[in-house]
Amino acid sequence: MHLAPHERDKLLVHLAARLARERMDRGLKLNHPEAVALITDHVVEGARDGRGVSELMKSGREVLTAEQVLDGVADMVREVQVEATFPDGTKLVTVHDPIN
């Protein structure tokens, strides 16, 4: 199987998000890369499901709370920008202050 670089990146983000979910299920708090991967995966999969940009910008803020991440992570993640593929093309989705 041959994957383009952007396809490998999407697969890596999905794998990191899956690992983050497994760690959350075990009661662990997420670190910075895990938190960003989980939010990114939420946006990418939401776009694939046909959800709109503004809806994903809002719902991306509801993926994680400050209690679910390690100390300092919420302060480090001020925004997450994701290029996601929508039915009408690729768009940049920015989730501001994603961890509340």
Curated annotation (Swiss-Prot):
Pathway info: Nitrogen metabolism; urea degradation; CO(2) and NH(3) from urea (urease route): step 1/1
Entry GO CC: cytoplasm
Catalytic activity: urea + 2 H2O + H(+) = hydrogencarbonate + 2 NH4(+)
rRNA-binding among keywords: no
Protease as UniProt keyword: no
The protein's assembly and partners: Heterotrimer of UreA (gamma), UreB (beta) and UreC (alpha) subunits. Three heterotrimers associate to form the active enzyme.
Protein name: Urease subunit gamma
Source organism of this protein record: Saccharopolyspora erythraea (strain ATCC 11635 / DSM 40517 / JCM 4748 / NBRC 13426 / NCIMB 8594 / NRRL 2338)
